[in-house]
Amino acid sequence: MAPSRKFFVGGNWKMNGRKKCLGELICTLNAAKLPADTEVVCAPPTAYIDFARQKLDPKIAVAAQNCYKVTNGAFTGEISPGMIKDLGATWVVLGHSERRHIFGESDELIGQKVNHALSEGLGVIACIGEKLDEREAGITEKVVFEQTKAIADNVKDWCKVVLAYEPVWAIGTGKTATPQQAQEVHEKLRGWLKCNVSEGVAQCTRIIYGGSVTGATCKELASQPDVDGFLVGGASLKPEFVDIINAKQ
């Protein structure tokens, strides 16, 4: 990892938890020794964004797990970037594979969401990744490059974008891409940014890995030169999340 890219660890709590158990998790995080050279962001369920922001140590940022592509309107069940900011969150996760595959979000819609979230001042954790059949068909690059292009076409300033590579076959399955597999895709993604955006953006943009990251797998993954952090699912709800945050130490 280049010295200019601060290590980044995001915890995606998904649709999990109630105030009691999330409060206990927050107490664990607040009491832990977290490295100053690692940026930490937690993404609670929408209903608990305000609760998390009030309880978490200020050095831990809060993200929403989704937002819509416009400011206001008749969009039942949606949340806008302005509302997210109003609750004290500063980041949003967009393009997660569960949004793509369960809720049918297209590359085009995700790009529009990224554009609007950035224009409203939120940082964006933009997710990309291939399914198992796509990896086995040898089209991983094609898939992730197309997904990245849909995002890149909507980004003017990359300073507030973190790209999260999450191989769908490794999410919640217990399977993890090997450090070498993760590094290979991250390196190719950085190469795509260099060729299609700019060398400066390629060097400065953090590309993080998501896909069954655990306390046991994080250190070797973190040692790869193009792995700039993690987007953690299930393990972010457990005390081992602290070990993952400390993976570079």
From Swiss-Prot:
Associated pathway: Carbohydrate degradation; glycolysis; D-glyceraldehyde 3-phosphate from glycerone phosphate: step 1/1; Carbohydrate biosynthesis; gluconeogenesis
Active site (catalytic residues): 96, 166
GO cellular component: cytosol
Glycyl lysine isopeptide (Lys-Gly) (interchain with G-Cter in SUMO1) crosslink site(s): 142
Positions carrying 3'-nitrotyrosine: 68, 209
Encoding gene (name): Tpi1
Keywords: Acetylation, Cytoplasm, Gluconeogenesis, Glycolysis, Isomerase, Isopeptide bond, Lyase, Methylation, Nitration, Phosphoprotein, Ubl conjugation
Chief location category: cytoplasm
Matching InterPro entries: Aldolase_TIM (IPR013785), TIM_sf (IPR035990), TrioseP_Isoase_bac/euk (IPR022896), Triosephosphate_isomerase (IPR000652), Triosephosphate_isomerase_AS (IPR020861)
N6-methyllysine: modified positions: 194
Chain positions with N6-acetyllysine modification: 14, 156, 194, 238
Family from the record: Belongs to the triosephosphate isomerase family.
Modified residues (Phosphoserine): 80, 106, 198, 212, 223
Subunit structure of this chain's protein: Homodimer.
Entry protein name: Triosephosphate isomerase
Domain of life from the UniProt record: Eukaryota
Catalytic activity: dihydroxyacetone phosphate = methylglyoxal + phosphate; D-glyceraldehyde 3-phosphate = dihydroxyacetone phosphate
Post-translational modification N6-succinyllysine, affected residues: 149, 156, 194
Function recorded in the entry: Triosephosphate isomerase is an extremely efficient metabolic enzyme that catalyzes the interconversion between dihydroxyacetone phosphate (DHAP) and D-glyceraldehyde-3-phosphate (G3P) in glycolysis and gluconeogenesis.
Residues holding substrate: 12, 14
Record-listed Phosphothreonine modification sites: 173, 214
